[in-house]
C-alpha cells in the first residue's frame, strides 16, 4: 500500500504564516496554553500487556509459563517443578533425622543409650512437606491436562499463533502470541472439556443410531475393533467404555484401511476409464445431469468451510474462526492510495493550456 505525500509549497507556507500572524494579533493567546497547536499525541502502551498470561492448572511459574501449544517447554517445566518438589521432600527428611547430643562420642557408661534429638525444628519439616506435596501435586495436574486428547487451551494458542504469522508478526516460540488474545478462563475450559467428554460418550454408545461405531461398521463390516453383537452394559465411566470398544488409534487404523480398500476398488472398477482425455465429455454429461457419478440425494450446503459439520452455532463459529475468510480476503487484497494535491498553480496551468490550444490548431491548419 503506497501513500503519496505532496511536497510543501513555499506560497502556501507564506500564506499560512500570514494567517497565523493575523490571528495572533486579533486574538490574544491564553497564558495557560504552553503547547503548540500541532502537538503530537504520544501513545504509552500498558505495561501489563507485555506480560504473558498463559494459562496453567498446577504450574507455579507465573509469567514464565510457556504457551499451551509448546508441549516440549511444558513438559520441561513440569519435570523441573516435580524435581523441586522432590528436593523439598529430601530436605524434610534431612531435618527429621535423629542425631545424638554432642555427636557420636564414646559414652562413659556403655549400657546407657545416647539421647537423640531432631536436626531441624518441626515447623520447618512440616513446611517442607507441604511445599513438596503442593509442587508435586501441581505438576501431576498439569501433566494430566497436557496429556488430554482434547485441550481447548492448546487449540486456542495454536489458532492465535497462526493468526500472528498471517499478520506478519513473529510470535515467541516460548510464550506464543500472547499479545493477540486473552486466554479463556478455567470455568470455560472445564465446560468445553465436559462437553467433549459427553460427545465421546454418545459416540461410543452402541444404542445411539448416529454413533461412531455405526459409522465404522458401515466402512468395514468385518472389523474386529468394535463388536457388532450387543453386550451387556457394564458399570463404569468413559474409560471402561473405551477399553471395551477399542482404542481410538485402533479404530482410526481400521478406518484408514477400509478407506484405502474403497479407493482402490473405485479406481479399478467405477473410475477406471476416467482420464484427462475424456474430461470434456464427462463434464458435459455432469452438467446435463446424465452422468452416473451424480447423486440425486446429495444436498450441497450453502456455505462450505472445509470438511467440518456445522450443526449448531458453536460449530459454525469454530469453523469460521479456523478459516478466517475475512482475514484471508484482507491479506489477498492490495490497496493503492494516491493523494493528489490541489493548489492555485494547477488551475493557472490548465487555463494556459486552454488558451494555447487554439493557436496550435491554427498553426497545424496552415501547415496542411
Swiss-Prot record:
A Pfam cross-reference name: Mgr1
One CC-aspect GO term: mitochondrial inner membrane
Membrane topology summary: Multi-pass membrane protein
Domain of life: Eukaryota
Mitochondrial intermembrane topological segments: 1-72, 142-368
Mitochondrial matrix compartment segments: 90-124
Listed transmembrane segments: 73-89, 125-141
Keyword set, alphabetical order: Membrane, Mitochondrion, Mitochondrion inner membrane, Transmembrane, Transmembrane helix
Region (Disordered): 1-49
Family assignment from sequence similarity: Belongs to the MGR1 family.
Function according to Swiss-Prot or TrEMBL: Component of the mitochondrial inner membrane i-AAA protease complex required for mitochondrial inner membrane protein turnover.
Assembly mode: Component of the mitochondrial inner membrane i-AAA protease complex.
Protein name in UniProt: Mitochondrial inner membrane i-AAA protease complex subunit MGR1
Organism: Candida albicans (strain SC5314 / ATCC MYA-2876)
Lineage: Eukaryota, Fungi, Dikarya, Ascomycota, Saccharomycotina
Amino acid at each position: 500500500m503506497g501513500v503519496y505525500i505532496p511536497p510543501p509549497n513555499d506560497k502556501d507556507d507564506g500564506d499560512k504564516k500570514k494567517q497565523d500572524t493575523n490571528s495572533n494579533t486579533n486574538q490574544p493567546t491564553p497564558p495557560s496554553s504552553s503547547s503548540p497547536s500541532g502537538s503530537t499525541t504520544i501513545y504509552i502502551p500498558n505495561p501489563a500487556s507485555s506480560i504473558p498470561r498463559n494459562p496453567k492448572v498446577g504450574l507455579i511459574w507465573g509469567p514464565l509459563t510457556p504457551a499451551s501449544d509448546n508441549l516440549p517447554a511444558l513438559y520441561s517445566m513440569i519435570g523441573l517443578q516435580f524435581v523441586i518438589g522432590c528436593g523439598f521432600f529430601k530436605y524434610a527428611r534431612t531435618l527429621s533425622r535423629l542425631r545424638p547430643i554432642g555427636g557420636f562420642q564414646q559414652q562413659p557408661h556403655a549400657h546407657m543409650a545416647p539421647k537423640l534429638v531432631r536436626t531441624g525444628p518441626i515447623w520447618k519439616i512440616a513446611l517442607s512437606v507441604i511445599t513438596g506435596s503442593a509442587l508435586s501435586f501441581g505438576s501431576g495436574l498439569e501433566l494430566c491436562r497436557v496429556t488430554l486428547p482434547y485441550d481447548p487451551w492448546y487449540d486456542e494458542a495454536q489458532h492465535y499463533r497462526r493468526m500472528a504469522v498471517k499478520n506478519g508478526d513473529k510470535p515467541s516460540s516460548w510464550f506464543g502470541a500472547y499479545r493477540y488474545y486473552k486466554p479463556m478462563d478455567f470455568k470455560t475450559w472445564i465446560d468445553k472439556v465436559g462437553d467433549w467428554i459427553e460427545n465421546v460418550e454418545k459416540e461410543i454408545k452402541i444404542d445411539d443410531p448416529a454413533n461412531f461405531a455405526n459409522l465404522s461398521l458401515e466402512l468395514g463390516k468385518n472389523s474386529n475393533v468394535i463388536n457388532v453383537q450387543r453386550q451387556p452394559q457394564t458399570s463404569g465411566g468413559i474409560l471402561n467404555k473405551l477399553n471395551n470398544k477399542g482404542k481410538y488409534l485402533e479404530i482410526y487404523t481400521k478406518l484408514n484401511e477400509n478407506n484405502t480398500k474403497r479407493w482402490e476398488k473405485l479406481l479399478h472398477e467405477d473410475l477406471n476409464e476416467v482420464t484427462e482425455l475424456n474430461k470434456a465429455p464427462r463434464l458435459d454429461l455432469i452438467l446435463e445431469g446424465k452422468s452416473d457419478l451424480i447423486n440425486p440425494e446429495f444436498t450441497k450446503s450453502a456455505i462450505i468451510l472445509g470438511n467440518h459439520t456445522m450443526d449448531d452455532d458453536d460449530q459454525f463459529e469454530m469453523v469460521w474462526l479456523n478459516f478466517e475468510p475475512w482475514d484471508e480476503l484482507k491479506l489477498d487484497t492490495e490497496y493503492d492510495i494516491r493523494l493528489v494535491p490541489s493548489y492555485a498553480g494547477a488551475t493557472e496551468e490548465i487555463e494556459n493550456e486552454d488558451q494555447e490550444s487554439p493557436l496550435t490548431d491554427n498553426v497545424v491548419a496552415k501547415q496542411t
